[in-house]
Amino acid sequence: MKVVSVVGMAGAGKSEVAKIFEKNGFIRIRFGDVTDEEVSKRGLELNEENERSVREALRQEYGMSAYAILNLARIDLARKQSDVVIDGLYSWEEYTFLKTYYGEDFYVVAVWASPRTRYARLTDRSNRRLTLEEATNRDRAEMENINKGGPIAMADFTIINESSLKELKREVKGVISRLRGRD
């Protein structure tokens, strides 16, 4: 079974793409669930500052491949039943860990949108909304602290998400068809 990771900057549309994969038979695993669970376990409010703090603490404890390590059992269990889509791989180290572990069964789909488009989405979304300052700070932190650019650069497929949801669905279904043709 395939493991497909969706990567991109905040607001690019990673979760939308992962949901489209899910609707097409993939089991969706959201790496950020580990963060949410840890924030809750620590009795903290779920907000950007606390999420960033927990993400960085987990990476301090487990290394930069923390989220791949912490989600590996969930991925392996899901993979026994179906192809898997990962929503939220971030670091180069997570990428190399999963690429080494799954080899030819591991694929990366990058979702790209311009900063202007992403910031508009992030300041307008209903859950986990960010201010413009929080969005730009998150971009900087993710590029500087967690090596987010590498997995985007190494993607097997790239989707430009500057248009409509209808167009995004069309693009994603094309990628899914190409992946299924690789069996």
Segments from the language model and where they lie:
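ATP-dependent small-molecule kinase phosphotransfer cores
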Residues: 27-97, 128, 133
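Conserved phosphate-donor/acceptor-positioning beta-strand/loop module used by diverse small-molecule
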Residues: 87-88, 101-126
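ATP-binding Walker
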Residues: 12
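Short, well-ordered beta-strand core segments
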Residues: 28, 108, 157-160
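Extreme N-terminal starter segment of soluble prokaryotic enzymes
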Residues: 1-4
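Small-molecule kinase domains that catalyze NTP-dependent phosphoryl transfer to phosphate-bearing small molecules
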Residues: 65, 124-178
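P-loop (Walker A) phosphate-binding loop of NTP-binding proteins
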Residues: 9, 21
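Walker A/P-loop
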Residues: 15
